[in-house]
Amino acid sequence: MRAAAGGARAAVLALLLGALHGAPARGEEYDYYGWQTEPLHGRSYSKPPQCLDIPADLPLCHTVGYKRMRLPNLLEHESLAEVKQQASSWLPLLAKRCHSDTQVFLCSLFAPVCLDRPIYPCRSLCEAVRAGCAPLMEAYGFPWPEMLHCHKFPLDNDLCIAVQFGHLPATAPPVTKICAQCEMEHSADGLMEQMCSSDFVVKMRIKEIKIENGDRKLIGAQKKKKLLKSGPLKRKDTKRLVLHMKNSAGCPCPQLDSLAGSFLVMGRKVDGQLLLMAVYRWDKKNKEMKFAVKFMFSYPCSLYYPFFYGAAEPH
């Protein structure tokens, strides 16, 4: 009897979440109808929960697969304006395609599906997305944020949103991806957005590259450095410029196949270490690059940046 009731509850949830590509959510051991509408994390809200359309100017979740979202969301955002501001910071991560369920996971929190009870992501969904995306975030100097710690989410035998696409069989042998820091923008706007997300921008020569603990270390030549954006760099940083490419020992970076000539590098200073965020071969004939360097300080930096900011709780 209990198993049958549990199966019925699972079927009801699967129907309600049908817009999420028809993927099952497991509810065999959870009394869905017994859920209480308690304040999230002990916080009380000035307004009762409401459902509204996911707007087009919430691009993180507008194409997630369902039309209506619940407010307050599962990150304690009470207004749509707050959701938009915080969610926009995660668009760069979504664009990196570090896991096929990144959008489903993030939108289950930022724009939860409109039901009369909050439905959390399963812990396994969080862990799968974290395994795919945390190394990429670490490469840019951003730890997996506290608000997304997977122990906060229910186990898969509870009523929750399970992995949607992560179990699909591979249709082709895996291809080694280019290092994240070596993915290039080809427009001036793209370059300037990268500059917005970086603490410093330097034109430099690279003397040598070393492999150390799974990272690459780019050691700059003593001379012929030009600081285009100094940010937090101090004299000791620029005297012997050493840039760390996190988690990049085993991935290709075509720009660094030859160290001849100069490079345009962008990075962040994290815990005293200079992390490389982007690298380009310097090309004085490249009009887009010349334009970006000339006008980077007058460019209206997007709210998406610095890269992955908004991963912390709002202040």
UniProtKB/Swiss-Prot annotation:
Domain NTR: 179-301
Ranges where the FZ domain occurs: 46-163
UniProt keyword terms in alphabetical order: Developmental protein, Differentiation, Disulfide bond, Secreted, Signal, Wnt signaling pathway
Gene for this chain: SFRP5
Keyword Transmembrane: no
Functional note: Soluble frizzled-related proteins (sFRPS) function as modulators of Wnt signaling through direct interaction with Wnts. They have a role in regulating cell growth and differentiation in specific cell types. SFRP5 may be involved in determining the polarity of photoreceptor, and perhaps other, cells in the retina. Inhibits Wnt8 signaling, in vitro.
Cell compartments where the protein resides: Secreted
UniProt GO molecular function: Wnt-protein binding
Pfam family, one: NTR
Organism for this UniProt entry: Bos taurus
Gene3D superfamilies linked to this entry: 2.40.50.120, Frizzled cysteine-rich domain
The family this protein is said to belong to: Belongs to the secreted frizzled-related protein (sFRP) family.
SS bond list: 51-114, 61-107, 98-133, 122-160, 126-150, 179-251, 182-253, 196-301
One annotated GO biological process: negative regulation of cell population proliferation
Protein name: Secreted frizzled-related protein 5
Gene Ontology cellular-component annotations: extracellular space
Entry-linked InterPro entries: Frizzled/SFRP, Frizzled_dom, Frizzled_dom_sf, Netrin_domain, Netrin_module_non-TIMP, SFRP5_CRD, TIMP-like_OB-fold
Signal sequence annotation: 1-27
Cited SUPFAM superfamilies: Frizzled cysteine-rich domain, TIMP-like
